[in-house]
Amino acid sequence: MRIALDASGGDFGYQPNILGAARAVKELKCEVILVGDEKVLKEQLASLGLSDLKGLSVEHAPDVIDMDADPAKEVRSKKNASVVVAADLVKQGRAKAFVSAGNSGATMVAALMKMGRIEGVLRPAIGAPLPTVKGLMLLLDAGANAECKPQHLMQFAVMGSIYTQKVFGIRKPKVGLLSIGEEEGKGNDLVKETYPYLSNLGINFCGNVEGRDLPFGTTDVVVTDGFTGNVCLKLEEGLAKAMFHMIKGEIKKNPIAMLGAMLAKPAFASVKKITDPDTAGGAPLLGVDGVAIVSHGKSSETAVFNAVRTAKRLVDSGFVSDIKQHIAEYKEIFEKLEAKK
């Protein structure tokens, strides 16, 4: 299996992408196409002693889309941008999936332009795996759609359920609707309008969940609009780092606490690994006709490796076919709602 990697994407340049790809080739038994400036990539591969690594190849793409650039405009004008070429490799059938830690908006636009949407999907969504005390939970949308309607959230719920079944191995995932209270009548207009539709959708809908419920894994899937979802995602990432920083500061104040911390070091390391965004590696773009992974801009070698691993797992699982099937089953419901807008 070949996976295309936007080697120019991310805040730290080529090296973490190359090292993560090399590790994936060695450990996952897959092939990775590094997409970026051919001259720079070959120089970096040589300096890292990876020029002859079987399964690692280079595809020339001289242009880069900056993090602060207009996604739609840049994707249309820069045909040779690394993220565009990576998506095109999937369209051509030369790769089964693509991964990018670059401009997330550009990644979504490139995926839509080159791979297209699954028929019947109104809007693709970013599904972010988040750590909880019970394991991973999927939050969507995590930033693709700032403004949403009930029919969009309904589709997010369906796609999120399929993802957690296929990737997390949960037979009947619990789905929650993010709100400001557990009661059905709580929330803004979007939440209130969406609630009855989710209740009658045939999924395992468990009602409203509050922000405080997310870290405890009350449900396996949490559905919300992209603006709220992205705020939740960034808050959880920042909170985990802040907690470790505060604990470290308090431990240093007390010699006895320092001794206890030494004994608890393995436990701290384990929790840190679980809460580290690099462990998930990336978030799938659900609803496009193929596998596309959106990674964090600050992705390390480990994050890149895990993003490639997620891409491979999704291809192997056949989850895109399952989404097509389920969206088709709900097509009449979605079309009626869309006609009312």
Curated annotation (Swiss-Prot):
InterPro entries registered for this protein in UniProt: FA_synthesis, Phospholipid_synth_PlsX-like
Keywords: Cytoplasm, Lipid biosynthesis, Lipid metabolism, Phospholipid biosynthesis, Phospholipid metabolism, Transferase
Gene Ontology BP, a term: fatty acid biosynthetic process
GO cellular component, one term: cytoplasm
Pathway: Lipid metabolism; phospholipid metabolism
Top-level taxon of the source organism: Bacteria
Cellular location(s): Cytoplasm
Spans traversing the lipid bilayer: none
Any one Gene Ontology molecular-function term assigned to this protein's record: phosphate:acyl-[acyl carrier protein] acyltransferase activity
Presence of the UniProt keyword Cell wall biogenesis/degradation in the record: no
E.C. numbers: 2.3.1.274
Reactions that this protein is recorded to catalyse: a fatty acyl-[ACP] + phosphate = an acyl phosphate + holo-[ACP]
Keyword Cytoplasm belongs to the record: yes
SUBUNIT field: Homodimer. Probably interacts with PlsY.
Function noted in UniProt: Catalyzes the reversible formation of acyl-phosphate (acyl-PO(4)) from acyl-[acyl-carrier-protein] (acyl-ACP). This enzyme utilizes acyl-ACP as fatty acyl donor, but not acyl-CoA.
Similarity remark: Belongs to the PlsX family.
PANTHER family xref list: FATTY ACID/PHOSPHOLIPID SYNTHESIS PROTEIN PLSX, PHOSPHATE ACYLTRANSFERASE
Protein name: Phosphate acyltransferase
